[in-house]
From Swiss-Prot:
TM helices/strands, residue ranges: 15-35, 59-79, 84-104, 118-138, 142-162
InterPro entries in alphabetical order: CarS (IPR032690), CarS_archaea (IPR002726)
Cofactor: Mg(2+)
The protein, known as: CDP-archaeol synthase
Top EC category: transferase
EC number: 2.7.7.67
Recorded superkingdom: Archaea
Alphabetized Pfam families for the sequence: CarS-like
UniProt key word Lipid metabolism: yes
Protein's gene: carS
Pathway in which the depicted protein is active: Membrane lipid metabolism; glycerophospholipid metabolism
């Protein structure tokens, strides 16, 4: 078994603190979304919806705002209220990543609720980290990102199963 020193655990904890606004944005969109689809029902030339009914205007906005609120909360804890901007960027990236994931699923012929392993779990994570990097030119160390991606896969599975059992989701993935 590989042992991680306390410094490694600290870096992983910092990474989790960093990505928390994206996690909460993704969860908030699921819990409080619904309503009008972000794509307004539009179809592309292939006859398939642009995004589908699962990506909604309300969910997108709630997700972005939730990310900003979590960022603000983190900022208040560490004495830097500008962290709200980080939370906004991470929330926006998470919602954009989720929308891109839905776009890809529609293009390959998968309907809403159809499983797309890894894509379903990491689209918001990749979107958040990518947008943060594009805006600020920074991301956690590579090994921390890999650790967070693995943690995200596990947490996503767990929260989806819980959501399914609580009848908040139609499918457990």
């Amino acid at each position: 078994m590989v042992e991680m020193g306390s410094g490694a655990w600290l870096e992983l904890g910092k990474g989790l603190w960093f990505i928390l606004p994206a996690y909460i944005a993704n969860l908030s969109a699921c819990l409080f979304g619904g309503g009008r689809p972000l794509d307004f029902g539009k179809k592309l030339s292939d006859g398939r919806r642009l995004l589908g009914d699962g990506v909604t205007i309300r969910g997108f906005i709630v997700g972005v705002l939730a990310g900003a609120v979590v960022g603000l909360g983190e900022g208040l804890v560490v004495g830097d209220p500008w962290k709200a901007g980080d939370g906004f960027i991470l929330g926006l990236g998470a919602m954009a990543g989720d929308a891109v994931g839905s776009f890809v699923k529609r293009r390959i012929g998968l309907e809403r609720g159809a499983p797309a392993p890894v894509l379903d779990q990491l689209d918001f994570f990749v979107g958040a980290v990518l947008l943060y990097y594009l805006v600020y030119g920074w991301h956690p160390p590579g090994w921390v990102l890999v650790g967070l991606a693995i943690l995200t896969l596990a947490l996503h599975w767990l929260t989806n199963v819980i959501g399914y059992l609580l009848k908040l989701k139609e499918v457990p993935w």
